Regions:
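N-terminal, positively charged, Ser/Thr/Ala/Gly-biased leader segments
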Residues: 22, 37-96
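Conserved small/polar residues in nucleotide/adenosyl-binding loops
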Residues: 175-183
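Proline-centered helix-kink/hinge sites
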Residues: 25, 41, 78, 147, ...
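Short alpha-helical functional segments enriched in proximate histidine and acidic residues
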Residues: 35, 39, 57, 61, ...
């Protein structure tokens, strides 16, 4: 299987292949990171990629498989987190110059759960400032582009995440949706 085919496989198919030892977390992560380094400059999906962290986690995940340890549901599966979510030790800008250099000490509980399930953290995806726009064009990182037509937007506020998954830059991205409620 070539790297492009690998990058467009679903998380559930990848998880099955990892458990069956047909493919390793390192192979998957290397393929995805290679694609990120090639396409992210054009698409601007990731505002803060974490390739070193991802490779460290992938090597650890692979060793756990070799050691016969119990595997989490996302063991070896690459994922990203929308930049509105706090991630301990990783810059969280919220798409705003106000927080351009913010590195939180706390993190969103789902980030902890994804890591505990064995996921491989690829980095933070772009979002418009504070997520309040239907186009992902952060004043810090610029415009995120649709991978199928660079003249179009992937939307917002999860434009980075949607472009990431559509372009095969990782099968999973944690975003969020805030809906207005009646008072």
């Amino acid at each position: 299987m070539n790297n492009e085919d690998l990058c467009f496989r679903s998380a559930s198919d990848l998880a099955s292949d990892i458990r069956a030892r047909r493919i390793s977390p390192v192979e998957i992560t290397e393929a995805v990171l290679d694609r990120i380094s090639t396409l992210n400059p054009k698409l601007n999906c990731f505002c803060t990629p974490t390739p070193d962290t991802a490779m460290d986690q992938a090597r650890r995940a692979e060793q756990e498989i070799m050691d016969g340890r119990p595997l989490g549901l996302l063991h070896g599966i690459p994922y990203s987190i929308k930049d509105l979510q706090m991630t301990r030790g990783v810059r969280t800008m919220r798409g705003s110059k106000i927080f351009e250099h913010s590195v939180p000490e706390d993190e969103n509980p789902l980030q902890t759960r994804l890591a505990n399930a064995g996921g491989i953290f690829l980095g933070k995806t772009t979002t418009p400032e504070f997520g309040w726009k239907g186009v992902t064009d952060s004043p810090v990182t610029g415009l995120t582009r649709n991978p199928w037509n660079l003249d179009c937007t992937p939307g917002g506020s999860s434009g980075g995440a949607s472009a990431q998954v559509a372009a095969g830059l990782g099968p999973v991205s944690y975003t969020h949706l805030t809906l207005p409620t009646k008072a």
